[in-house]
């Protein structure tokens, strides 16, 4: 008998690949363990390859299984997107967009973009999530986000990008810092201070860029605290726990007890970038791109 791959096969495979345990996967699927085994063997027969390495103690994906899992995750993500878009259309809404962003996007273009987009398409449904750069890129690759506002040097092959804003850096110090009254402050004036920085989890390339600033100033910073949140950095600085370097735009929109010293003389610049997956067929993507190109 000739079998063909059906959606249920792929869903059974996905659950087993997540659990890597036949009994647990069968329980999630509300089927018997032998029934699940038959479905997986049927898939392996259709694909003419082994998808799982099985032993008495463990279950692991083969290389073919790992590849299939990547594709299956994208497939089910797209199916979820289709369902969401159909539901929005049924509600009378044009479409929905899922936007990821880092904090500095809120202080620059994001509010204006949302206002313009809502003006053009009042019924569009928008979900916002503040996320790290790395998380946004991962979610864009899986079609779990439609757009991301990130700070990156390079993007994966399936991700397109559009530079939005290039800016210099600023030094953040407590309002009561003893050097505050000194004229013509330089970064090297703070070389003995503890530094609070965005961590590598925020963006590896951004972290490396900031560290290059210190190298150019001929000192290694004493980095005592790292975080992925701008407000956390400002609160820590205001408590006298250190000083920080951030994109200059972050001086706007936060009510914090800190001062900003512009580092315009430093050649390093950081760019806020709009990123999206060129394989994503969400009908709202062209609408947002049209609006943002009008704003730039």
Predicted segments — roles?
Residues 195-217, 282-285, 289:
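Secondary-structure junction motif
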Residues 44-61:
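A short LG(V/I)-centered, amphipathic sequence patch enriched
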Residues 2-5, 89, 112-116, 127-129, ...:
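Short beta-strand-centered segments that line the small-molecule binding cleft or hinge
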Residues 14-32:
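Short helix-boundary/capping micro-motifs
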Residues 13, 25-26, 62, 117:
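Hydrophobic two-helix hairpin corresponding to the core of helix-turn-helix DNA-binding domains
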Residues 109, 259-296:
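A late-sequence structural motif
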